[in-house]
Amino acid sequence: MSSAGVALSPVRSEPLIMPLVRANSCLDSYPDDTIMIYLTLPGSVIPMRVLESDSIESVKLRIQSYRGFVVRNQKLVFGGRELARSNSNMRDYGVSEGNILHLVLKLSDLQVLDVKTTCGKHCRFHVERGRNIGYVKKQISKKRGDFVDPDEQEILYEGEKLEDQSLINDICRNDDSVLHLLVRRSAKVRVKPVEKNFELSIVAPQAKDKKGREAKSIVPPKKLSLEPVVVNSKAKVPLVVKDMIQSASDGLKSGNSPVRSSEGTGGAYFMQGPSGNKFVGVFKPIDEEPMAENNPQGLPLSPNGEGLKKGTKVGEGALREVAAYILDHPKSGNKSMFGEEIGFAGVPPTAMIECLHPGFNHPKGIKTKIGSLQMFTENDGSCEDMGPLSFPVEEVHKISVLDIRLANADRHGGNILMTKDESGKLVLVPIDHGYCLPESFEDCTFEWLYWPQARKPYSAETQEYIRSLDAEEDIDLLKFHGWKMPAETAQTLRISTMLLKKGVERGLTAFEIGTIMCRETLSKKSLVEEMVEEAQEAVLPGTSEAAFLEALSDVMDYHLDHSQEH
């Protein structure tokens, strides 16, 4: 995951009414379209006056001014939908008087810990906010061999013992946080804030010689399991996927619990390997997706089953994550024939699994969870962390091909990781595909549209890859792996693949094709949506899918040729 994580930020419990400030306006009078909305965060409701005509960007700027949350770190959710278009206004999204909006914040995922003893010994290490107390114990002992064994440590907060699964992000919330580390030889840890970090001072008597320490084995929970979900026994599972699943399973058996990430609007867990020194995968349970029954981030249940993005359903994100990996064919051909090769866009290996562990969010009792497991990618951050000018053109193009094909409704810089290959070249890795393959094009969003690389022509190699794509083969391949796509979703894949191939035939760039798919504003339909409506009007009711696609092909040819003439 990137170095930036998404979390529901802790706030003061008292409400704060954010004033509506306009030039030449009186403090006791407001424009006619003024409304009162309520921003909710854990433990807090914040009344806020806005105008129905205010843009989403301007509302976020006011939140930044009064609460200090940077605009790019904010997500607003209303009525089960993310207010993702910055230039759209509150009225466009149907926000009116008295409505409740959920504010999700992205914070730094790294916490610097300074550990000191009264005898002058000191060490410093970085801890991800998604790490737990058990990990902190191991790091303290590992950094300083004369510290107490992790098994001999107990950490209390406000008089209550913290379990090893407790997250740093959930504990270090208040400026006056004090942690007491109780060891068999009675040690204490006091935490005080130092700017954005925490400083830990440890008081402990001289530790015993390592040889004199009592060896303790880690005893994992009695009930735990991690197995692949196999729908078709004939479907070949790539070796890299088998190894990932085995490593995650061995990690659980070794007592290395899942570590919940503070990133994202749904539940996501870092799965550790048997050594406990590195992550091997990221598990996203279906029942913890945004607006699902057991979502741990405080989002409400979906009122109609629709996901945060139009054309998606709650609980189908894991299927789409796996589908993106399966359909990311390598340059040499269909992934069903060459399962061991890396896909053209580089989607990390992903599989559907079932896992039982008490470390997940189980408000109604511990049960087996089904979800997607994606290989963890070591990275240097995400594309949000730096400007796009340094991104290689081919790296941006490969992601654009994937997003256009799958009609991705949630491509932003935060879900494109940056890493380097063996030669030191920058490589972009696309992740988070739970909102691809929607049933409509309404929410298609491609951040790379605004990057200069998108205006460059596709290389001959990329064009050849695009020509090799076949939507019907893709639909059959997903069915072979266990997902019989809904008719609307299959139609989206056929249309987006058709547009991509026709666009490349005419020499269109990623920017030009992507612009056809994405709406300029929330209320103005995209050109591809208009093409679909035109084709639907040209055929009789009850017409076959093949006849509709033939009509759409003619409509698409006309619009693409006409646009080139101008």
Curated annotation (Swiss-Prot):
Residues 430-456 are annotated as: Activation loop. Signal peptide: none annotated. Its main location: membrane. It comes from Arabidopsis thaliana. It catalyses: a 1,2-diacyl-sn-glycero-3-phospho-(1D-myo-inositol) + ATP = a 1,2-diacyl-sn-glycero-3-phospho-(1D-myo-inositol 4-phosphate) + ADP + H(+). Residues 261-267 are annotated as: G-loop. Autophosphorylated. Interacts with RPN10, UFD1 and CDC48 in vitro. Residues 250-272 are annotated as: Disordered. GO terms for molecular function: 1-phosphatidylinositol 4-kinase activity; ATP binding; protein serine/threonine kinase activity. Residues 34-111, 112-190 form the Ubiquitin-like domain. ATP binds at residues 262-268, 284, 374-377, 432. Disulfide bonds: none annotated. Belongs to the PI3/PI4-kinase family. Type II PI4K subfamily. Keywords: ATP-binding, Kinase, Membrane, Nucleotide-binding, Phosphoprotein, Repeat, Transferase. Induction: By salt. The phosphorylation of phosphatidylinositol (PI) to PI4P is the first committed step in the generation of phosphatidylinositol 4,5-bisphosphate (PIP2), a precursor of the second messenger inositol 1,4,5-trisphosphate (InsP3). Undergoes autophosphorylation and phosphorylates serine/threonine residues of protein substrates. Phosphorylates RPN10 and UFD1 in vitro. It comes from the Eukaryota. It is a peripheral membrane protein. The gene is PI4KG4. Its EC number is 2.7.1.67. It is found in: Membrane. GO terms for cellular component: membrane. This is Phosphatidylinositol 4-kinase gamma 4. SUPFAM superfamilies: Protein kinase-like (PK-like), Ubiquitin-like. Residues 407-415 are annotated as: Catalytic loop.
